[in-house]
Amino acid sequence: MSIYSKFTINDVLLNKESLQKKNKYTCPICFELIYKKSIYQCSSGHYACQECWEKSLEIKQECMICRCKVKSFKNLSRCLVIEQNFSKKECNCIYSFHLDYFIDGANQENEDEENEDEENEDDEDENEDEENGEDDEDKDEDEENENENEENKDEENEKRKLIKDEENGCKEIINVDQLDRHIQNCKFKFVKCSHIGCDRVLRLNSLKEHENQCGFKLVKCEYCACDGIIQVQLENHYDECPKFVIGCPQGCLNFFERDQIKSHIENDCNNSTIQCKYYEYGCKVEMKRSELQRHLENVNHQLFMGKLIDKLSSTLDQSMKIQELLLKEIEKSKITCSELQRKNDELSSLITEIDDNYFNKNDFINSWKLTSQGYTNKWIISNYSNLVENTPHPEYIYSPSFDIVSREFVISIYPNGSLTGKDHLSLFLHNNNEDPNKLEFTLELVNLLDKSKSITRKGLEVFEEIERKGWSKFLASKLINKKNGWLSDDDKLTINIYVKILYDDIEPLES
């Protein structure tokens, strides 16, 4: 049985000649070693591999050796002693051999696959020949060719010999039952370099060193910081790298980064050919930049300078005219800006006036609503239970004040009763104004569990200046709790408020 690609247990087993002579660990039917085979025995102790037993019992229900009756495979017993003893035999690791054997084996496997394909094609041809009624002589020739191919394979397998890699191979001796796990973890296994383009195959324990030096590893350019460059192509990259330092191609002996060379040649290099500064005005001489100063000193450029002065004067005149036009446009813009600012101020004043009228109108509407419909709100008192404990009879607390048409009012509550209402909740409406007011008012203690049980008290009174009116015995204090519905789960008491200012009827005009 194959343990890795083309390898068999015979390739790595130690003392295999001795084991084969004893025939103790070989199936007596198929003559294969019992590596990774399930071994079963008859009642007389004769054993063979599971595959051989199954094939034999399909033909005859008897032992292949002693001929004792075996009705079915279920009548056999597992021969664990033989299996366990063989699993403890020693063997070499497959990676103790040279790489050449792995490569040759891989090539041989490819050849075997090709031969199988050819055989399949031959079989198809044979079927076609039979259908077409060809002679049996062609079949005999094909069979002879197949036999020759098999003989050639056997000869090639005999020629292939495993050669130990004494210097770099795995030297560990392991038990048969540990072979698969060792192969998976062996540090001497053959692996391929992970870098794309590198076909190098080497042992795992030398992979890291190789990959650090591999010509196909990706590196970063030290000049332009470009990454993802293959090591062997780095020199080619330097030929194009914009930050690689090179000498001036015009031989001025200065060095610059490649992307700065163009600017150097156009603006600074003494060996660059340039035109005389008066070239546009008639001096058509070209020279190296280093010779410009000597040219200017040795050649009379007065005529050319005169042309330059004339051109500059003309340009200056045009600039002055443009400046005058721009100044006029600026003055026009200033006038326009002033006019726009004035209109903006007018609009701002108009907007302010509209806003004032709007708010005055809203105030009037709100005052009218309060006058005609009355003031409606609610007073929610938090932590009422603590308030009862901390406000003894006859102390009280005030609600936040509220205004009705510029008149101030407030509600007072006595949790434990006023002077005349001990052990009761007392509620009063206070007129905090110096003028008397005729008021229609309602105070309602809200029952949160059943709104129909809410207690409402109504009054129609004339309040003199700084006076209160209300009820000293609104509800017994001991009844106000969560169970009865007067307090919420978070201990809040709610009082609804309604107050309306009443005015005397206007008397008719008489004459």
Swiss-Prot record:
GO terms for molecular function: zinc ion binding. Residues 109-155 have a biased composition (Acidic residues). A zinc finger (TRAF-type) spans 181-234, 236-293. Residues 374-499 form the MATH domain. It is found in: Cytoplasm. Its main location: cytoplasm. A zinc finger (RING-type) spans 27-67. GO terms for cellular component: cytoplasm. It comes from the Eukaryota. Residues 103-169, 324-358 form a coiled coil. InterPro entries: MATH/TRAF_dom (IPR002083), TRAF-like (IPR008974), Znf_RING/FYVE/PHD (IPR013083), Znf_TRAF (IPR001293). Residues 107-159 are annotated as: Disordered. SUPFAM superfamilies: RING/U-box (SSF57850), TRAF domain-like (SSF49599). Keywords: Coiled coil, Cytoplasm, Metal-binding, Repeat, Zinc, Zinc-finger. Probable adapter protein and signal transducer that links members of the tumor necrosis factor receptor family to different signaling pathways by association with the receptor cytoplasmic domain and kinases. The MATH/TRAF domain binds to receptor cytoplasmic domains. Belongs to the TNF receptor-associated factor family. A subfamily. This is TNF receptor-associated factor family protein DDB_G0290931.
